[in-house]
Amino acid sequence: MASRVFQFSLLIFVAMIFGAHGVSAAEPMAPPDIRTTFFTGQPFTATSPSGTKFTMIFTPDGKMTREPIEQSGTKSAGTWKLNAKGFCTAWGHAAANCFTVVPSGENKWSVQRTATTIATTVAVWSK
């Protein structure tokens, strides 16, 4: 009986070790990969945490637009640039905010604010 308890305990321990290492969070995309995936002038969809959907267009020359797909949300334009970890945007005359892009499923990416040590998802991009 003690042998079976030991074997069961060992099995649980091994499962925990391999399970902890087998599941890892996706790494943020490298800035050049963000550029070639999204900043090409081709439209893609962004969904805010509240569910508002926008058609986004980031052009290679550093300009961007967003247009609401539904009636909620406002159309706006701004500029973008790559940084060491991801990219930064400035909408209209607002101050710049910086983000990373993390793959989150097939043809889906989480856009996360990088201003703090805790990642905050501000949109989900899809193609």
Could you tell me what each predicted segment is?
Residues A2, Q7, G19-A77, K81-K127:
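Lipid interaction determinants
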Residues Q7-V14:
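Sec-dependent N-terminal signal peptides
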